[in-house]
Each structure stands twice: as C-alpha cells, then as structure tokens.
Amino acid sequence: MSTQRVFALADYLQPSDQEPVRSVVSRTQDTAIVAWHVKPGQHLPAHSHPSGQDTWVIMSGTGIYQLDKEGNTKIIKAGDVVIAPTGAVHGVYNHGTEPLVFAGVVAPAESGFELLG
C-alpha cells in the first residue's frame, strides 16, 4: 500500500488532441482519484456510474455540464464542486478558450461505467 498522501495534480495531466485522457492519480478499494485535462472543443460524453458517486473539483477553465439524460445543462467553472450521485447521467463540453482541468473522485473505485446512448 502506498504511503503517499499528497499529489500534484499537474503531474498527472495528459493533454491530448484526440479525446480527453483519464489519468489515475490514486486508486484504492474505496476510491479512484483521476485527473482530467479537457481542451477547448473537447467533451466527456454523457455517462453514469451505476454503483457509485462521481465528484469533480474544477481547478481551471469552464464547461457545459450535462445534468441528466434529458440533456439539461449548467455552466461549471474553476472553484466549483460537481456531484453526480450513484446512477446519475453526467458529462461535460469545454466551450471555453482554455483547458478545463479537474480532479474526479469516484467512490467506490469499482462503480462501473455506462455510456448514455
């Protein structure tokens, strides 16, 4: 078991011109902590985690966050904490001019992943 308790999020960001890359910062049985770097014009497609909650802490940038399967949205920005309860559909589109950077915490780590569609 790792004893590291402090992580620099910037060390895990992986900008990509294709699609955003999910970089695992830390993973235990209880949680998976991931770093996201979403370039302007990129998106994370609408999805859900059938067995767990997904919480995002927005570090920089802005995005259009999908709140449900009906397509309702809300603007998210640096400083926001965004929670998708168990089974809730969510996704994000970076409509801004700078990268959308956030840390995501999925609990439990094995929460499943289902794309909407």
Give, region by region, the residue ranges found by the protein language model.
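Short histidine-centered beta-strand/loop micro-motifs
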Residues: S23-S26, A35-W36, L44-P50, L67, ...
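A short beta-strand-loop-beta hairpin characteristic of the jelly-roll/cupin
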Residues: Q53-A78
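Intrinsic-disorder/low-complexity, polar/charged segments enriched in Ser/Thr/Lys/Arg/Asp/Glu/Gln
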Residues: P20, T31-I33, H43, T62, ...
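A short, N-terminal "cap"/entry segment at the start of jelly-roll beta-barrel domains
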Residues: M1-V34, P45-A46, E114-G117
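Conserved hydrophobic/aromatic beta-strand scaffold that supports enzyme active sites
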Residues: V24, I33-H37, T55, T73, ...
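Ligand-binding loop in jelly-roll beta-barrel domains
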Residues: I64, K77-A78, T86-G112
